Amino acid sequence: MEALWTLTLALAAGLAAASPPNILLIFADDLGYGDLGSYGHPSSTTPNLDQLAAGGLRFTDFYVPVSLCTPSRAALLTGRLPVRMGLYPGVLEPSSRGGLPLDEVTLAEVLAAQGYLTGIAGKWHLGVGPEGAFLPPHHGFHRFLGIPYSHDQGPCQNLTCFPPATPCEGICDQGLVPIPLLANLSVEAQPPWLPGLEARYVAFARDLMTDAQHQGRPFFLYYASHHTHYPQFSGQSFPGHSGRGPFGDSLMELDAAVGALMTAVGDLGLLGETLVFFTADNGPETMRMSHGGCSGLLRCGKGTTFEGGVREPALAFWPGHIAPGVTHELASSLDLLPTLAALAGAQLPNITLDGVDLSPLLLGTGKSPRHTLFFYSAYPDEVRGVFAVRSGKYKAHFFTQGSVHSDTTADPACHASNPLTAHEPPLLFDLSEDPGENYNLLDSVDEVAPEALQAVKQLELLKAQFDAAMTFGPSQMAQGEDPTLQVCCQPSCTPRPSCCHCPEFQP
């Protein structure tokens, strides 16, 4: 698939950009910093993503503010820290009463106001609510095809993950309805046939792009793939072909989907008019061992504030506008809303944003205005505030806590058995020389360097000022759960949850 779209790159580089550009935002799930070939994995089969990296701008220091699904997705779409919106602690469940508050302004709403045709394919995980109140159509998306939460939030022991009949690994969440596939607010299938899901999303994406072109308007597509979240699945062409087992097969299908999306853009003659941005929601779920991803040389993974949890691969691709290369500038998923709004000529919402405009960095006219990053625990509170702060090359951990998602690694600091620990003084790392956070500069047998002492004072001040200014929004998760809010294809059926069963045809 990659050959079809890469052949047009030379032509695309000479094309004038549409004003505003089309935007394709691809968001992977539980993907580690070291999982792509372009980030050094020796055996990953990711030719399309590697081509994006070769033809675009590859970030080495791109972060998410929280290493967990729901809060990370909220940050991406709003440019705001999840604690401001009440999206804590943990993640939203299928029966949660809460969700992304309707007064929050999403990237889709910003771009829709600028005339974009907006759509989301894939994973939502920002709430369902009463009568679907929190679903994408109520947050600025004109079209939605996807699962409203994570595909393991329902029983999966009877589902097929790899054709022709390989069952899904594990049993996932019991006592819940089967996972639903929604088209806008309607149930398409419950459960969907997982091996055919990615192809359906690609077809949906192609239709959205085509319709936008016919309507003479730009498109914004948020392609939120379920890959590579557990339990992994893939279509017919991928099982056993990756060399990395089920995880690699899932990653291989994600890469092929990227190739298919780029082919669709190329077929429409829009490569020079389309900005593509790829990243992921959090680091790998290392507890899954061979069924989880790889954080490379970084410490820990999902659920922690160590680098393996919060540093992500990120690629920006726009032929003729974004010069190929590598940037070591600091950047965050929080920055995408103000950046893409600037490139689209759209007005920013009149609300406190935590993101900054990276368009000068992307277009080669300046550097990143971001110098500081604040990282929250997946289970934050106002007493402790941020767990870690990065400023320039230095990062300080004021609190650390392991996570079940990062169990089974060789490092006990990552494990769920590692309790919440306050560090006084904080752990201090020079990430320019020690990205693996192995050598605490304040734990030296020799005299601590004056530069390190100055750095920790600055980081302590940054944390104190930031915590003092931050106001947590009322917790959406604290609203509790109502089993009747779970999506059901037969709303009045009994007995629940088993009666909510409207499976689609399996080839």
UniProtKB/Swiss-Prot annotation:
Glycans are attached at N158, N184, N350. GO terms for biological process: lipid metabolic process. Pfam families: Sulfatase, Sulfatase_C. The modification 3-oxoalanine (Cys) is found at C69. It catalyses: an N-acyl-1-beta-D-(3-O-sulfo)-galactosyl-sphing-4-enine + H2O = a beta-D-galactosyl-(1<->1')-N-acylsphing-4-enine + sulfate + H(+). Hydrolyzes cerebroside sulfate. This is Arylsulfatase A. It comes from Bos taurus.
